[in-house]
């Protein structure tokens, strides 16, 4: 049998396994968007059964033989097929010792955790989620203990899963660099910065008008509307089941219209990635293999670098006035720009400004690193969270809902949060390169975001799933990730915004 014939057989197995993966994803989407509370337990069981079927299909002797043989000899395969085999082999090496029973139990635990988190958040009571989080940590440790190629710590292993090649040493250095320049800038703004008007930010804006604006923004970003759906959820996310079925979610607050604007732009960035990977990637099962940091790069790019720019605020200002029906008639374009960029330490990560956002990420990074590595207990999380928010941001956390329960991420294995900060830094570096090819902000000022989408499609989306993070950013920009570009961008922008001398 030729190697191409072997890959053809492997592809058929992956085609079948993908049916179960998509079914799980659709049930999860329903659970987070529209399933009744009383139906969540059954949905969780259904998802675990389907996950078990997917697991068994990708852990047969035939599957293992095809993957290992092709990994040893990939002659005849296309470059994309070779990358697929490489990804599958890495996953196989990590999962090959996990019994099906353990995988099923882990799936049940993760699915139960979501409903427990939602209940706990609504009650503002961490104790209702405490046992689920402890269970997730325990199962994660069990699965990682079965790996043959051990990392220095549990959290190092999780970082390598989410950011290929990522490690505590790498991220400690990255966050040290950010902390050294962001914290002094925040303090300077608090001590010397000019006042910025934000009183109008809490004016009521009817949800139907916010929804209409969301759809308008998604169209501006260049998303294919017939391949997309927009819904609401407690904690916004975007998922997809191929390039022609992308699901975007947001959350509307009547007294915080800005939250939805930037959530929509953020999630729309994820959706653009999903709609614009090469067809070959989907056909050969390479799609969606990029790291979380690569994905968050694009969502943060549209949310902040485009969405909060003077150019884009100039464009959307008249549309916002039109849709709001006079609610913001006394607000000038400049006042809107300053308000959506105002740096004010607060409680909520999702609604954080561009400057203090990374401090929110550092807190989560430090906590999940500690609880995954057994340095703190689950019971210590709420108090430590509150203390870190006081130390880093100078704010008092009133309850668990606005504290350690605000994010959905700990209903799954830890390690995702650093991706947001990495993505922010990647984005600025990519923008510097993009600006060499065309006037990005002249396009944004006209509301013409299609050249941006097309450039990203050609230079970013086209290689992400078949490269490591370092290969990817070097291919796009000519150098490895350099956080200095991100920090210089923040210093320049916020010094000008607050008239710092």
Give each language-model segment a name.
Residues 1-166, 466, 491-500:
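A well-structured
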Residues 2-6, 22-28, 38, 42, ...:
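C-terminal, non-catalytic "cap/extension" segments appended to globular domains
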Residues 10, 148, 259-278, 296-300:
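Active-site recognition of the HExxH zinc-binding catalytic motif
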């Amino acid at each position: 049998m030729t190697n191409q014939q072997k890959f053809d057989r492997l592809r058929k197995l992956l085609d079948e396994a993908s049916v179960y993966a998509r079914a799980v994803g659709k049930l999860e989407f329903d659970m987070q968007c529209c399933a009744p509370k009383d139906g969540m337990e059954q949905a969780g069981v259904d998802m675990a059964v389907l996950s078990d079927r997917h697991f068994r299909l990708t852990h047969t002797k035939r599957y293992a033989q095809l993957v290992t043989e092709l990994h040893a000899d990939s002659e005849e395969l296309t470059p994309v097929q070779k990358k697929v085999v490489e990804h599958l082999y890495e996953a196989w090496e990590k999962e090959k010792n996990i019994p099906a029973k353990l995988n099923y139990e882990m799936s049940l635990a993760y699915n139960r955790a979501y409903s427990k988190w939602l209940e706990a958040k609504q009650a503002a009571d961490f104790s209702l989620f405490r046992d689920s989080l402890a269970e997730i940590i325990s199962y994660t440790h069990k699965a990682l203990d079965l790996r043959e190629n051990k990392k220095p710590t549990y959290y190092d292993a999780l970082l390598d899963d989410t950011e290929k090649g990522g490690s505590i040493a790498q991220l400690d250095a990255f966050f040290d660099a950010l902390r050294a320049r962001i914290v002094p800038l925040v303090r300077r703004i608090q001590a010397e910065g000019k006042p910025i008007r934000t009183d109008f930010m809490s004016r009521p804006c009817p949800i139907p008008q916010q929804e209409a604006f969301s759809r308008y923004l998604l169209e501006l970003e260049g998303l294919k509307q017939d391949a997309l759906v927009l819904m609401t959820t407690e904690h916004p996310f975007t998922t997809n089941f191929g390039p022609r079925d992308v699901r975007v979610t947001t959350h509307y607050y009547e007294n915080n219209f800005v939250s939805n604007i930037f959530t929509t732009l953020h999630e729309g960035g994820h959706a653009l990635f999903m709609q614009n990977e090469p067809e070959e990637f989907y056909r050969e099962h390479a799609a969606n293999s990029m790291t979380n940091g690569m994905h968050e790069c694009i969502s943060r790019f549209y949310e902040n670098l485009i969405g909060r720019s003077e150019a884009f605020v100039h464009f959307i200002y008249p549309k916002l006035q039109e849709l709001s029906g006079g609610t913001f008639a006394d607000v000038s374009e400049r006042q809107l720009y300053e308000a959506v960029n105002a740096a004010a330490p607060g409680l909520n990560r999702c609604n954080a400004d561009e400057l203090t956002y990374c401090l929110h990420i550092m807190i989560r990074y430090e906590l999940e690193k500690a609880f995954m590595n057994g340095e703190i207990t689950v019971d210590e999380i709420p108090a430590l969270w509150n203390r870190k928010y006081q130390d880093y941001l100078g704010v008092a956390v009133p309850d668990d809902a606005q504290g350690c329960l605000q994010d959905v991420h700990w209903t799954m294995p830890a390690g995702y949060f650093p991706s947001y900060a990495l993505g922010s830094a990647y984005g600025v570096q990519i923008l510097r390169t993009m600006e060499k090819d065309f006037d990005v902000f002249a396009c944004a000022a006209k509301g013409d975001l299609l050249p941006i989408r097309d450039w990203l499609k050609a230079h970013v989306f086209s290689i992400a799933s078949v490269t490591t993070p370092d290969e990817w950013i070097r291919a796009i920009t000519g150098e490895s990730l350099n956080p200095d570009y991100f920090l210089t961008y923040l210093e320049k922008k916020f010094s000008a915004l607050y008239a710092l001398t």
